[in-house]
């Protein structure tokens, strides 16, 4: 009978389409859920879980049925079957390791999230309720506290100073509660470190004003500091600036000087994420007096005045300061120092970050991400933007009024996923000239230099040499100096003899008119001025940028909260739900959004729409500037082929050059490359990414929350030291900055990294850019602490130790950075731990402890080294019935795990008697306990236990010994243990047969043992004498079984070929043998796959010990194809076989097809043995053998056993790569390509092969 035949006979039931039955079933369940929800709702209903769809995995408290009712009452969805595309949250209290890997990247949440959200009356953040996270088993995520007190210190240098007049005790006591200040934390300013963004606590304004969707509008009054205002106190405290540098370094490491700091840390433990509120009143007053005709609001310090840098004027805020500032602001401005010229100044760090645009960009991204999260937490399900669209779209409402008057979407068609990418056009330029109509239509650039594009040449600087160095490094990929003569004769590298050079100020953004002339973002202003002498320079206006970015996100939030904050000028929005509700087309909705953004911000935005994030971004490229483009699904193939590979995310200069060397320039060229070839060239992850992206495939979801992986702070501008003490003091100051950032995020770090940029030997001492780092070498040192910390003194001490080991020339230092990794939460809340029901046993005295608790305690106490020395482990599995909650002890099986060296812990811990436990057995038992035999218990560990715990374990061992002697005299009935609870009539259950009497003495599963030739003699000799005797007896028994099996096989008729395998015969075998003989190869050995199919004793005897599936497969092969016998005869023939009496036909009249097998091998260990024998004994694989392996892999895909498929593929890859014959690598590529094609067609994805 061919596989799938039983399905084909049922094709005429109305669901001919593949997967149509399940799709219809799921749709019916969803409709049933909606109808039940309409009947269940009463006065206590709400829309807290609107847009949330849960899937319950396993036992939970509340139960799955209770959670279903809660989702009905509160506007959520409950999925009986998990869907990766539809299910938003998975609810579970415990998952096996295989499930954790399978659900990697999904939101696995504890049920307390639902219960506590209902209690709170709003949707809480799921991060504190995650069951597992990517970082570690103890990290639950970031927790932010929106409460702050006036006396708390600042979290970072970009915030306003602790004191207004540089006096410690001068603190404002009364803060008006009409406004709240948005937390403005710190993060690395490095543009490349986007994943290290840090979230900000978003506090709402409570003052009257226009709001959208419950969120205050920023135009009434600005209550959020943008962070560009520098503080009077930087990373160094005021008293540190008044003492000599030597005393400063020593004092900060001494215990006496840290008492006040410890007190301050203790007092601010619960309010780390807060920014200063002392200037709140003054900020509100100055904002109210803003001049509406200017883009900037006011200037708080002389830092915003024009200052000569590199021969050009540098300004942060355009125009003069407001003359109507309050007295408090004026006092603060006078107290603020000027721009520091040395890193030893007190406020150097804070001033650096306040002027760094890259720091502001990363800070705004974190702030906007938290803004979106706050919107989701406080959502009431009402969106003003949608209501406006519904009124515009008259006669095409998506809502259908049912007979009962309820509003529902039952009859609405299911829309395909639709992602919208919104990107502002030339963001910095558009904001800078929105109130300057004279500059519109002209080439404009945002930069710090507003001069002629030239700066005076400083003595010792050699700009031409640096230019040649970087050009050579980028274009040719060489890191060496292009011409050694340039180092010896610096003057020869000068472009000309003039006393001025081109300005090195970078262009942050340029208009499209400037881009048409060859100017690009990131270009030096001097070079851009040469290309376009009429280029107009516009200064930075951080306050205006932030205001427009906030307006952009508020506009999007009026339609939906499913937003991913990409940057201050860029966002991804999932508009699938909006289109379904409003019945608008994607183009109509995009046009409405663009018009509203333009009205609110006076800036234009481009919109791209696609079925996934990749296509939406590509569509935006075509839509720019000031346009929109909808990439329809039917247009994707033609559109994607013509796209350059550089348009794909993740493809930079290096990868572009590597692809060009392969003759690939477009995505169409890339589509001709197989995944195996791409993974070989670029690695498994990058190869798979390129394979999918070039076909327009992208399954990345719109993410609103991201976990923080590191905290860092780097400065590579203005770093010039003359003495070691200055460098040490700066490291301590940067450590204090790291402490503030860690405290602001509520995290501690364990791994510390110090990065130093040192001038390259021979490079000019004076850099081409004033204060820049020039040509440098990067040096890094890393240390891992015993415990995670956020203390500046501990971090600073570690930094100084690593710094001293570098033995650097202090004057050559050009950059310093500190990175903290391996983050853990500062406070672990015990209430967030998964709650589990207590398991107590009435069979033991002092029932407050269970056997599970005993082994969990012992497991926690064992070190890693001891775990590697353990040969056997006790597998304790407790399952509590949610109905009875009773504990029933069963007579245990002899439980010993195999000693195979290639059996890992994950395999061992999930097996029972060396075999996988049937799920049906576990589900019908209230409690099943396995404890090791008395010979396996460590007596020293047993004696260290508490008396009552030790007594419990001893009693269990005594019961085991008594039952093992009793089992020798009494055989189990039909292979089933008498301790199993009775079941209702008609229950289909596969039982594991009791071991034979000859096996009961040894307690070893002989099938699971490795070959005796594979046992390491040294390991065997190190085992206890009793265990050695058991293993020898087990091997003797297996040898006797093999002899008996061989004898019975020779006497019986030949077994017919497996009817499930329809493979080709060997092609031109004689010709290939002849070719081999000319080379002098040995005689061809018959394939082990054929030998295994016909001669394996373990597979031909249906009575052999093994798993139920093995018994079934052996029986089916022994009896012949099931179609040749009537079902009655088949049922009668199985009645005498242990463990097979329950094998019945299904209601459709078909026998269940056998499990996928490779020449009869079903279990993974048997498959591994067969593959190893095949690859190591055959030099040239036959085509039919390769096709047999391909069919086995595709059968695994059909049975949805992808975990075993992954193990088989990886094991074959390791074996075939070790072979010296190149034909094996070709065979593996052929197998993998076929498997990936089937996976792609079945699941829409491929297997990651590392």
Curated annotation (Swiss-Prot):
Binding positions for dCTP per the UniProt entry = 357, 423-427, 509-515, 521, 569
The protein's name in its UniProt record: DNA repair protein REV1
Any one GO molecular-function label of the UniProt entry: deoxycytidyl transferase activity
Stretches assigned to the UmuC domain? 419-652
What SUPFAM superfamilies does the entry give? BRCT domain, DNA/RNA polymerases, Lesion bypass DNA polymerase (Y-family), little finger domain
Give the primary localization class. Answer: nucleus
Gene this chain is encoded by? REV1
**Which residue windows does the record flag with biased composition (Basic and acidic residues)?**
260-273, 1034-1045, 1117-1128
**GO BP field:** error-free translesion synthesis; error-prone translesion synthesis
* Stretch list, region Interaction with target DNA: 352-362, 652-655, 708-716
Residue ranges with Polar residues bias = 275-320, 1046-1055, 1131-1145
Membrane-spanning intervals of the chain: none
Q: What class of enzyme is it?
A: transferase
Region Disordered, residue ranges: 204-236, 252-329, 1034-1101, 1117-1146
- Residues of the BRCT domain: 44-131
